[in-house]
């Protein structure tokens, strides 16, 4: 051992702090490795909380630590950090070294998710066994954790802690060191093959404490009933040593899983979920896209972990269960017992509160990953990627029934989102296509319908079983001991699932019922309308590309800058985007028809109705509005029409055209000078201009062509709503010289003067010719324009 080992722990910590910021990461890690190897646990105990904070950052987000969430593989520090934090690396070696002793570390309750924090403050111990025997009386506001628990709590908290990262740090979340570490820890502590590697140090004190045994005379409280056992009654000073040696095998696995689930998913209790249905309630927590992606990684691995259950352990025979290892037993119950309820409430919140944009794809894929466990079985015969013709094996019918709400209720939630989303956008169209493709898998819709039929079974058969007692965690049991009696039928399981999540008085809306079918038909109409809009945008972009050619720069094209599509439609769509939108929406229509058994006649009728409305020019009308003193006000229907690109306002400048902001293609000095000249002329000759424009002969036509009259403004205002004050404002005929300040006009004049100079024309003769040619050109243009109007 190094000579400095005789120093007091405070000196070791002080020395580390003094040199920490002055050394590069690789040197710090090298020295830490040496310290972990050379020093005993008694001296390492003092530096452990400080080291965890230096790596993961502070819980309040002020200190960012190693920025694992932004540390990308291309960074030089990436491999150093990954090697140090590996499950078999120096940091975990330190954890195990401290775990072999009876050291405890404090974790503030204030940094726990809201429902857990509220429960503890109310004197009710959370259902999760992770928190048993972690709190002391009198209440200190702290959890007392062993080293492994403390490490994992800080690791999980760093994902949701608000951190002020330096600007300019960008990268893919799925390539970050944090994301890769989560995947590494899941594969190490929840292995699909073999067992969890043993700790390198003797450990008899690190096991998860078993909850107090539950009395068998506790009555069953019904579907979804919650235990209100008091905190004082549950806190007993039990030994942390588990009497069963086989359970030593998975204590780290169960701890890691419970920490991840509680810290990442348990942000909304069932009661809070019910309250959040009201828009007046402020949401307590909003996950980030990165947070959701990590949750999806957790869901995918748990499905893979659960599907690796040995065939002999899948048997429902009690004798088979009695011979299962603790890890195999964990695989059996991991999804239903640990994840289902909290993930359902988490996804419900995201479906209801996430912005209506393409970032919802992360939430969507998390949901689709959970409801397709058959994708993660590793079956060689079942490895097609989301193949729509792949039949869902019959063995998954029980999973569908026991997770019915995650199929039906969340599908209805997605349907409501889709009807309010801009489906002209290819990214949003892709999400509709993905959901329709998943639910169109053969036999899946039949399984869902079967589950709904089981839920509708009468209650009398269930009431006969009211004496059954389930040792669930909320009634004092542990996660691994909470198995339902083998005689429980499918009806009971489905009803228990629905009532436990939605409450005894829930009004279940059938996914294949008449109300939902109406919503599906409405979505199909919106999809058809979005296809029409995409086609119109494509045609418009083609037309604008032709008008904005090189020749149009010289004046041949239209100078109207208010006629283009507004917003980001043209930027995001493009030819390829329109093509993808059509492809996604066409396939989504086919899949929806398969799911809800719509025949070709019904589909063609819906699409033809949309096409006929579009051909009648409805798409060129204003959105649905009601008049008011301040102009037109959008209705709910009008908002939906704008969101889906069905109708739009023509956004045009409604003020004085001469006072518009100076454009980049105009000379500022000339704009101001010509405005002064035209204002002087209009003030002196305004009445004569009005008389000229009011004539119905040829001179009146020429006057209206050259002078800006009220008729042109009235024509523009038909396309865009205006206030009553703007509508009542009188418009007078006047001369506008602003077009002469355009650089395009100036360049055209320069080229004409150069041409006439080559033909030996002088300055005054060239000016006269230009005026005559311009007058004749405008005269002919006005003549043909009037002819077209009369026809």
Swiss-Prot record:
Gene Ontology CC entries for this record: endoplasmic reticulum; endoplasmic reticulum membrane; Golgi membrane; nuclear envelope; sarcolemma
Annotated catalysed reactions: a sphingomyelin + H2O = phosphocholine + an N-acylsphing-4-enine + H(+)
UniProt-listed GO biological process terms: cellular response to tumor necrosis factor; ceramide biosynthetic process; glycerophospholipid catabolic process; sphingomyelin catabolic process
Example GO molecular function: sphingomyelin phosphodiesterase activity
Cofactor(s) annotated in UniProt: Mg(2+)
Enzyme category, top tier: hydrolase
Chief localization: endoplasmic reticulum
Alphabetical list of InterPro entries matching this protein: Sphingomy_SMPD4
UniProt xrefs under Pfam families: mit_SMPDase
EC number: 3.1.4.12
Membrane topology term: Single-pass membrane protein
Cysteine pairings via disulfide bonds: none
Membrane spanning residue stretches: 755-775
Locations listed in the record: Endoplasmic reticulum membrane; Golgi apparatus membrane; Nucleus envelope; Cell membrane, Sarcolemma
UniProt KW keywords: Cell membrane, Endoplasmic reticulum, Golgi apparatus, Hydrolase, Lipid metabolism, Magnesium, Membrane, Metal-binding, Nucleus, Transmembrane, Transmembrane helix
Biological function: Catalyzes the hydrolysis of membrane sphingomyelin to form phosphorylcholine and ceramide. It has a relevant role in the homeostasis of membrane sphingolipids, thereby influencing membrane integrity, and endoplasmic reticulum organization and function. May sensitize cells to DNA damage-induced apoptosis.
Designated name of the protein: Sphingomyelin phosphodiesterase 4
């Amino acid at each position: 051992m190094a000579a400095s080992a005789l120093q007091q722990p405070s000196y070791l910590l002080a020395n580390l702090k003094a040199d920490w910021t002055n050394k590069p990461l690789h040197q710090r890690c090298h020295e830490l490795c040496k310290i972990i190897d050379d020093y005993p646990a008694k001296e390492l105990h003092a530096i452990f909380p400080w080291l965890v904070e230096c790596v993961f950052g502070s819980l309040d987000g002020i200190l960012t630590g190693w920025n694992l969430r932004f540390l990308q593989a291309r960074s030089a520090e990436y491999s150093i950090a990954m090697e140090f934090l590996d499950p078999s690396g120096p940091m975990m070696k330190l954890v195990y070294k401290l775990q072999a002793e009876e050291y405890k570390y404090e974790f503030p309750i204030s940094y726990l998710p809201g429902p857990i924090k509220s429960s503890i403050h109310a004197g009710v111990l959370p259902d999760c066994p992770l928190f048993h025997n972690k709190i002391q009386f009198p209440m200190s506001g702290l959890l007392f954790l062993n080293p492994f628990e403390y490490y994992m709590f800080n690791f999980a908290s760093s994902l949701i802690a608000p951190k002020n990262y330096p600007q300019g740090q960008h990268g893919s979340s799925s390539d970050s060191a944090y994301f890769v570490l989560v995947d590494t820890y899941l594969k190490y502590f929840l292995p699909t093959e073999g067992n969890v590697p043993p700790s390198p140090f003797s450990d008899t004190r690190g096991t998860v404490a078993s909850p107090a045994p539950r009395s068998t005379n506790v009555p069953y409280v019904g579907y979804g009933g919650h235990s209100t056992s008091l905190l004082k009654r549950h806190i007993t000073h039990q030994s942390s040593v588990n009497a069963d040696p086989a359970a030593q095998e998975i204590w780290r696995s169960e701890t890691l899983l419970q920490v991840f689930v509680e810290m990442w998913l348990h942000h909304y209790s069932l009661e809070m979920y019910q309250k959040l249905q009201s828009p007046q309630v402020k949401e307590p927590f909003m996950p980030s896209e990165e947070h959701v992606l990590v949750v999806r990684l957790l869901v995918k691995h748990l499905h893979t972990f659960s599907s690796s259950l040995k065939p002999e352990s899948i048997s429902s025979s009690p004798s088979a269960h009695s011979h299962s290892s603790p890890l195999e037993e964990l695989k059996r119950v991991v999804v239903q017992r640990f994840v289902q309820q909290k993930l359902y409430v988490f996804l419900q919140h995201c479906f209801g509160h996430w912005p209506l944009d393409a970032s919802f794809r992360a939430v969507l894929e998390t949901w689709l990953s959970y409801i397709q466990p058959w994708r993660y079985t590793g079956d060689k015969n079942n490895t097609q990627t989301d193949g729509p013709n792949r039949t869902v094996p019959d063995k998954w019918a029980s999973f569908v029934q026991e997770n019915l709400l995650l199929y039906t209720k969340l599908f209805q939630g997605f349907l409501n989102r889709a009807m309010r989303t801009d489906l002209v956008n290819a990214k949003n169209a892709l999400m509709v296509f993905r959901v329709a493709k998943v639910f169109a898998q053969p036999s899946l819709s039949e399984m869902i319908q079967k589950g709904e039929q089981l839920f509708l079974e009468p209650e009398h058969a269930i009431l006969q079983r009211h004496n059954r007692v389930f040792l669930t965690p909320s009634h004092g049991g542990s996660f691994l001991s909470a198995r339902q009696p083998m005689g429980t039928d499918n009806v009971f399981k489905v009803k228990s699932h629905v009532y436990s999540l939605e409450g005894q008085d829930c009004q279940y809306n059938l996914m294949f019922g008449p109300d939902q079918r109406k919503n599906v038909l409405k979505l199909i109409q919106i999809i058809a309308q979005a296809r029409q809009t995409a086609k119109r945008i494509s045609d418009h972009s083609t037309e604008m590309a032709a008008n904005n050619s090189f020749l149009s720069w010289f004046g041949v094209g239209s100078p109207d800058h208010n006629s283009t599509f507004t917003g980001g439609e043209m930027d995001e769509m493009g030819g390829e985007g329109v093509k993808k939108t059509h492809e996604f929406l066409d396939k989504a229509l086919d899949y929806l028809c398969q799911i809800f058994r719509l025949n070709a006649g019904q589909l063609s009728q819906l699409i033809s109705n949309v096409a006929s409305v579009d051909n009648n020019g409805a798409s060129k009308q204003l959105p649905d509005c009601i008049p008011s003193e301040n102009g037109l006000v959008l209705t709910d229907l009008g908002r939906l029409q704008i969101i889906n690109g069905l109708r739009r306002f023509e956004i045009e400048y409604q003020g004085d055209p001469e006072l518009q902001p100076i454009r980049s293609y105009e000379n500022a000095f000339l704009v101001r000078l010509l405005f002064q000249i035209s204002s002087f002329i209009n003030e002196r000759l305004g009445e004569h201009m009005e008389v000229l424009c009011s004539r119905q002969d040829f001179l009146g036509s020429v006057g209206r062509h050259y002078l800006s009259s009220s008729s042109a403004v009235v024509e523009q205002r038909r396309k865009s709503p205006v206030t009553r004050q703007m509508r009542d404002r009188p418009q007078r005929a006047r001369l506008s010289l602003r077009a002469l300040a355009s650089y395009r006009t100036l360049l055209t004049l320069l080229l004409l003067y150069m041409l006439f100079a080559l033909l030996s024309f002088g300055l005054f003769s060239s000016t006269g010719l230009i005026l005559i040619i311009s007058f004749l050109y405008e005269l002919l243009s006005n003549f043909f324009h009037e002819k077209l109007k009369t026809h």
